[in-house]
Swiss-Prot record:
Disulfide bonds join C80-C187, C164-C179. Residues 268-546 form the Protein kinase domain. It holds the Pfam family PK_Tyr_Ser-Thr. The lineage of its organism: Eukaryota, Viridiplantae, Streptophyta, Embryophyta, Tracheophyta. Residues 223-552 are cytoplasmic. Glycans are attached at N37, N59, N69, N106, N118, N137, N154, N169, N180. It is found in: Cell membrane. Its main location: membrane. This is C-type lectin receptor-like tyrosine-protein kinase At1g52310.
């Protein structure tokens, strides 16, 4: 495996290097082509865009438009700004000649962007309304004639304070006049320079770079996932089987019918264990190495083939946990089906709750709390550790076996489909028409989720605490009563200790402890499935209440 990992890593690094060289070659090609065509780039790759009906200027950087509206300089400037520009500013003799031709073809004079400025520090000077235009070129306009009532020449400083510039076709190329005078005007805006081939180069660069980055990221991600999965597989091999979600017990095998008859003494009544005979019965037996097992005999079925049966048992046998009854093997013989699982010494929970075995003693509070906690751990394993999740679907007192230390072991995991439908109906539709352990969404809408198991556990938890069955006869007047119909009035009256099983006479818990357990019961049995807690949360809550069992 290590050699394969090194080989894969070398191949991946080689692929990344090749892609990087390909990217550099592509970029060099683009760079060389750009360098060789640098001379013709401006001519062939750039286009100048102007607004409709505007004309490009001599320097290819501005667009100009003539407007014949006769108005003042201020209003002309405001109008030009609506286009995102200003009155025309002149930075060269070419621009002056261009604006003169644009204006003189229509009228005698037009406003442009020049205006007088008079300050106490710098004195009188000319400036342009467009701040991006260079300062006034004195060599171009050494002396601007002023045509106002101030007379020709520069006039007084007070007269020159509100003078604006216009172009003309007369002897003077430009002249100054009162800004409130009315003239046509010429506006200028920056041209929009577009690159024809730049977009193509950018697209090529983006595609090549994106491909390189995506491929590199995908390879790195694959390497990380592969390395992580490899570590996970190694850890599963050395981890504790109790924490694994798919550990196959080494003793799992397919038995012959002769082997089963031999180990159960031909399924004698002496070897028959207490249980539900309607499903075929359960018998005790022993393997050749002396290990005790239980053999569950299922009723004949013509709907399931041998291959399907073995497949289901194999899948169920992988679900190994200390609080789940382990499957040791199975047998299929001419339609007869048998399941062999580990023997749990103390038998089913319902016997200890309702019919204490001869020579046994009633369950005290600590025992019951330990049973509930270990059972919750087994269910939480099915919901949270197994992928995909396993829904038990048939959590009830007779499906919980107790070991010698009164730890719970959940039986029938993954085997609910082997129980005939009519038997399921008899189990779930209990006396009085109630549905016992089944969640309402499963009964009425056939919706089965892990939350259905949480509901069933809540019913069973109340049964463990109270010693009452999910449905039980009261008297001739009341008839049958569900466990919640009995418990709810006591809960509402805060009579917590009256909920306890009357056989609990020693080691009674405090009322607040019983209240916490009953609150957990009602939390698990809420009508809305999404409001029920996860089994891992239930385990945590119960572990906070568990007290060490008394050693007697």
């Amino acid at each position: 495996m290590e050699l394969k990992w090194v080989s894969c890593r070398k191949q991946s690094l080689f692929l990344i290097s090749c892609l990087a060289l390909l990217c550099l070659a592509s970029l060099d090609t683009i760079s060389c082509e750009s360098t060789q065509n640098a001379t013709d780039f401006k001519k062939r790759s750039q286009t100048v865009s102007c607004p409709p009906d505007w004309i490009i200027g001599p320097n290819q950087t501005k667009c100009y438009a003539y407007f014949k509206n006769s108005t003042s300089w201020e209003k002309s400037e405001m109008f030009c700004r609506t286009y995102g520009g200003h009155l025309a500013s002149l930075a060269s003799s070419k621009e002056l000649s261009f604006v003169q031709k644009l204006c003189n073809g229509n009228v005698s004079s037009c406003w442009i962007g020049g205006r007088s400025m008079n300050s106490s520090t710098s004195g009188f000077r000319w400036s342009w309304s467009d701040p991006k235009t260079p300062q006034w070129n004195q060599s171009m306009f050494p002396k601007v004639p002023i045509r106002t009532r101030c007379g020709n020449g520069n006039g007084s400083s007070s007269c020159r304070a509100n003078i604006c510039i216009a172009v003309t076709n007369g002897s003077s190329s430009i002249f100054g006049e009162r800004c409130n005078a009315s003239h046509a005007f010429v506006c200028a805006v920056d041209s929009d320079i577009k690159c024809r081939n730049c977009h193509k180069y950018l697209v090529i660069l983006a595609v090549v770079s994106g491909l390189i980055l995506f491929t590199t990221f995908a390879i790195i991600l694959w390497l990380l996932v592969y390395k992580r999965s490899k570590k996970r597989r190694k850890s599963r091999k050395v981890s504790n089987p109790a924490s694994s979600s798919s550990v196959v017990p080494p003793s799992w095998k397919i038995f012959t019918s002769e082997e089963l008859r031999s180990m159960t003494k031909n399924f004698s009544e002496a070897n028959r264990l207490a249980g539900d005979a309607k499903t075929g019965g359960t018998y005790s037996g022993g393997l050749s190495d002396g290990t005790k097992v239980a053999v569950k005999r299922l009723k004949r079925s013509s709907f399931q083939r041998k291959k399907e049966f073995y497949s289901e048992i194999r899948r169920a046998a992988k679900l190994y946990h200390p609080n789940v009854v382990a499957i040791k093997g199975c047998c299929y013989d001419h339609g007869e089906r048998f399941i062999v699982y580990e023997f749990i010494a103390s038998g089913p929970l319902d016997r200890w709750l309702h019919h204490v075995p001869r020579g046994g003693r009633s369950l005290d509070w600590n025992m019951r709390l330990n049973i509930a906690t270990t059972l919750a751990q087994g269910i939480a394993f099915l919901h949270d550790k197994v992928k995909p999740q396993v829904v038990h679907r048939d959590i009830r007192a007779s499906n919980v076996l107790l070991d010698e230390e009164f730890g719970a072991h959940l039986m029938g995991v993954g085997l609910s489909k082997f129980v005939p439908w009519e038997v399921m109906q008899e189990r779930t539709v209990m006396a009085g028409g109630t549905y016992g352990y089944l969640a309402p969404e499963y009964v009425y809408r056939n919706e089965l989720t892990t939350k259905s198991d949480v509901y069933s556990f809540g019913v069973l938890l109340l049964e463990i605490v109270s010693g009452r069955r999910p449905t039980q006869a009261v008297n001739s007047s009341v008839g049958w009563q569900s466990i919640f119909e009995w418990a709810t009035p006591l809960v509402q009256a805060n009579r917590w200790l009256e909920i306890l099983d009357p056989v609990i006479t020693c080691g009674l818990p405090e009322a607040c402890v019983v209240q916490k357990v009953v609150d957990l019961v009602y939390s698990c049995t809420q009508n809305v499935p999404s409001m029920r807690p996860r089994m891992s949360h239930v385990v945590h809550q119960l572990q906070q209440l568990v007290q060490p069992l008394e050693v007697k």
